Amino acid sequence: MYKRQAVELPMTVGVDVKCDRHTRYTILLVGAFDSNKGQMELLQAVKRIVAEGKDILCYLVGPDVGFMPKCQKYIQDNGLDNNVKIVSYTQQVVSYYALADVVLVCSTFETFGRVAVEAQKCGLPLILSDVGANPERIEDGVNGLLYQKGNIAELAEKIEILRDENVRKMLSKNIDSIAIEEKYGIDNFASSFCTLLGL
């Protein structure tokens, strides 16, 4: 009779880039183009912001699984070509973290949330939908912001709050990058894997 033993293997992220800033307020959403990832919700928020006469640049980075054409049509129909850039495939996702002031996770549901951890390792403030494991990733108003999933007005408002560089710096300062590295770094993964193998 074998006795089963379970060992949790932590997800790992290997992002060591400290991100450079620039003059145009830039936001980033990384994820496959899927209706559950929230690209359309973010586009609607960007439309509201642009309609108020404010400049913003939004990068949507991720592979297409059938939803990208709908996003492209929305961008074109609403005159957002100068405000939204789609990157359908890249092996250099880290370079887009380096361009961003803020990273968003607008998913309908989220479990581990690798993008959120990568952003935190870059020292970037987050705006997350209030679903799944997202509320566990941050303390709202301390090291990131939460918004009610589906509330476009609130999402646009949170994006505008982080236009203020001082607010972004405050949130970034409160990110515990050491704890993130200890929990999700390769050393922790290797240790857990060795435990699993009985080494």
Language-model features: locations:
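A conserved mid-protein helix/loop that constitutes part of the nucleotide-sugar donor-binding site
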Residues: Y25, L29-R48, G66
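Nucleotide-activated donor-binding/catalytic signature segment of Leloir-type glycosyltransferases, i.e.
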Residues: C71-S88
